[in-house]
Amino acid sequence: MDKNGEIVEKIKDEKSINQNLDFLRNYRDSYNRTPLMVACMLGMENAIDKLVENFDKLEDKDIEGSTALIWAVKNNRLGIAEKLLSKGSNVNTKDFSGKTPLMWSIIFGYSEMSYFLLEHGANVNDRNLEGETPLIVASKYGRSEIVKKLLELGADISARDLTGLTAEASARIFGRQEVIKIFTEVRRA
């Protein structure tokens, strides 16, 4: 059995976790992921409480800088994200590229997750290492409803990334017509 198959067996339920506490305590796979990260990736919601209770590694990072919350978001595991935030995960944590959970939810088009993260305090003006804000990311990917929500919440419409592009300029470059209409309406108001 490969290492990830082995870890899945060891975290599949509370009994398995209890039997393997010593093994799980310091376990990392070849990508430096903890058992909690693997559970978040695979949607093993029943394992989350027990893993957090025993190991409290909410902010540990893998080789890309992703935390358990970022893995839950990347895999659209809303229930798990909710559980992690209730246990103290940082809604504004960043991976090594500077992307936050909100940025990842926008990139993947997980609107419900994006709204959830915003309701739980995600920073609308945070920046990744390219200088992009969530508004620039949403504009670039054509996420018009999220663009509207970010503007409602006070996202900086004039923010520029490291190349000098604003959210509106990004929308134009990527041909995001719905987003361009939103910025046109904002200018008219």
UniProtKB/Swiss-Prot annotation:
Swiss-Prot/TrEMBL ANK repeat ranges: 31-60, 64-93, 97-126, 130-159
Alphabetized SUPFAM superfamilies for the sequence: Ankyrin repeat
Record carries keyword Cell inner membrane: no
InterPro entries found in the cross-reference section: Ankyrin_rpt (IPR002110), Ankyrin_rpt-contain_sf (IPR036770)
SMART domains xref list: ANK
Signal peptide per UniProt: none
A family per Pfam: Ank_2
Keywords for this protein: ANK repeat, Repeat
Protein name as it appears in the record: Putative ankyrin repeat protein TV1425
Organism: Thermoplasma volcanium (strain ATCC 51530 / DSM 4299 / JCM 9571 / NBRC 15438 / GSS1)
